[in-house]
Amino acid sequence: MSLNIETKKVAVEEISAAIANAQTLVVAEYRGISVSSMTELRANARKEGVYLRVLKNTLARRAVQGTSFVELADQMVGPLVYAASEDAVAAAKVLHQFAKKDDKIVVKAGSYNGEVMNAAQVAELASIPSREELLSKLLFVMQAPVSGFARGLAALAEKKAGEEAA
């Protein structure tokens, strides 16, 4: 399907706007993937706040010009799906987890803070907990001493009340 020049310009602007605020851009090759699998991948990406798009590589190369992802342009060959996210690990995590389930998706490369990553580095990035997970762990660690102190006071008060009643 051939796109006219105006449609291509609009697509490049839309993609540029979507990746302008992204910290991470990950590209994965797909060959022979079923429609249901692609729909599931899109749903997972949407749930995690990841911009996921299949598009022509020439349009993707134009969209990354002037961004921190310009170094990734060399990797844009073949049938690719592009995932971008403001969360540093979300795009890598979505594609990596889906690639584990479906061998027709193969993570090729990624870029984080202007650094190009190979598939192994993207897998490492995907293994890092998300910001929300890290914040919840930090909150739990900070809350544990306080809740322990509160339980200790409650037990002491209960013990005193039991002694006074006897």
From Swiss-Prot:
Query: Where does the sequence pass through the membrane?
Result: none
Pfam entry (one):
Ribosomal_L10
The source's superkingdom equals Bacteria
Q: Which GO terms describe its biological process?
A: translation
What PROSITE patterns does its record include? RIBOSOMAL_L10 (PS01109)
Q: Name one GO cellular component term.
A: large ribosomal subunit
State a single Gene Ontology molecular function: structural constituent of ribosome
Task: Please verify whether the record's keywords include Cell membrane.
Answer: no
InterPro entries assigned = Ribosomal_uL10 (IPR001790), Ribosomal_uL10-like_sf (IPR043141), Ribosomal_uL10_bac (IPR022973), Ribosomal_uL10_bac_type (IPR047865), Ribosomal_uL10_CS_bac (IPR002363)
Keywords, ordered alphabetically: Ribonucleoprotein, Ribosomal protein, RNA-binding, rRNA-binding
Classification via SUPFAM superfamilies: Ribosomal protein L10-like (SSF160369)
Q: Does the keyword Ribonucleoprotein apply?
A: yes
For this chain, the family text in UniProt reads: Belongs to the universal ribosomal protein uL10 family.
Q: How does it assemble?
A: Part of the ribosomal stalk of the 50S ribosomal subunit. The N-terminus interacts with L11 and the large rRNA to form the base of the stalk. The C-terminus forms an elongated spine to which L12 dimers bind in a sequential fashion forming a multimeric L10(L12)X complex.
Function summary: Forms part of the ribosomal stalk, playing a central role in the interaction of the ribosome with GTP-bound translation factors.
In terms of PANTHER family, this protein maps to:
39S RIBOSOMAL PROTEIN L10, MITOCHONDRIAL
Protein name per the record: Large ribosomal subunit protein uL10
User: Which organism's genome codes for this protein?
Assistant: Neisseria gonorrhoeae (strain ATCC 700825 / FA 1090)
